[in-house]
A protein has these predicted regions:
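Unusually extended, aromatic-enriched hydrophobic runs near protein termini
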Residues: 8, 27, 32-33, 70-77
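Short helix-onset patch at the extreme N-terminus, typifying the N->h transition
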Residues: 5-10, 38-41, 70
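Mixed-charge, Lys/Arg-enriched low-complexity segments
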Residues: 40-77
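A short, structured beta-strand/loop element
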Residues: 17-45
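Short, charged/polar N-terminal "headpieces" of proteins
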Residues: 1-24
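Intrinsically disordered, low-complexity segments enriched in small/polar residues
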Residues: 2, 14, 32, 55-58, ...
Length: 77
């Protein structure tokens, strides 16, 4: 199964939406401006149950950023 999906935003022109299907995380960012515009949300109203879980999610966010850099550099930077 594919973990990440990248799609153009249907709400904002020039923005992209990256979804982590394994961990229910969505990142929205403006094309060529990832570092300054990234916005993360959890799907389905998910919330962190503990500080430990929040720290795990930091790893998932880094993995998403690495995937974007490695596979879609032209859209991110």
């Amino acid at each position: 199964m594919t973990r990440f999906i990248l799609q153009r935003s249907d709400r904002q022109q020039g923005w992209w939406v990256c979804t982590d299907l394994e961990h229910n995380i969505v990142c929205r960012f403006q094309e060529h401006n990832y570092n300054d515009t990234q916005q993360f949300t959890l799907l389905d109203g998910d919330k962190f149950d503990s500080e430990h879980e929040a720290l795990r999610y930091a790893t998932y966010l880094r993995e998403m950023a690495d995937w974007l850099r490695d596979n879609h550099y032209d859209k991110v930077f």
